[in-house]
């Protein structure tokens, strides 16, 4: 009887602990709006166009780690604009001690998620609460992008077409992103998408997001997404991305130090990615160099 009672206590304690690190997605998702712009947005990280001052602010960033549910220790103000070509994302990330608060491991694209300060946005174009395109940057404008499926499957090999610039001051670092609509996937007549905004404050080992996401899950658990409305993207259409490559092989044969034969081979090839519709992509590879080819990636369509 004593043993049964002990096990009951353990189970109750485990359930209590689990309840502290997870919670259900809200029945009414957070709602935010984007501002349509007609002026040219210069992607320089300064956020000094008039449209940025007029756009609604997003400031309710909540800790995921280390203290779930607590306000962020350093404030973040994000805003979203759009026009017929781009979705623009801007953010002002406050710091306590200026540049000394920032941690950046390297300047390589697709940098480490955990070892760098970063700001990012996940976009669920179909509102299926499963799939998302993630765009991130560190304080020095290095890009990182991921495809996320079900909050558990990650394609880190994906490279989307987008641009970003950042600025660092004594009290902030600012982000200005321009994401082409033809990089994103969404249905015809789209007027809203799902988003999760994130920031890693590495000096405090702190990760914050809007909306809040339980620490038991990856931060890109899209059932917790906010709804971004007020958008009028162009109809989704086909676009083509070409990734060429060239390999040069030079062979020399010498006998007793004398060159007797020299041969140079040039090999050309590449990959063509053709987005034929809002939820279909065709990949073509020609003259593949299998020594350089990626292994098969796990992926999924949005529907």
What are the language-model segments listed below?
Residues 20-303:
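Structural preference for beta-rich elements and adjacent junctions enriched in aromatics
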Residues 1-26:
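Bacterial Sec-dependent N-terminal signal peptides
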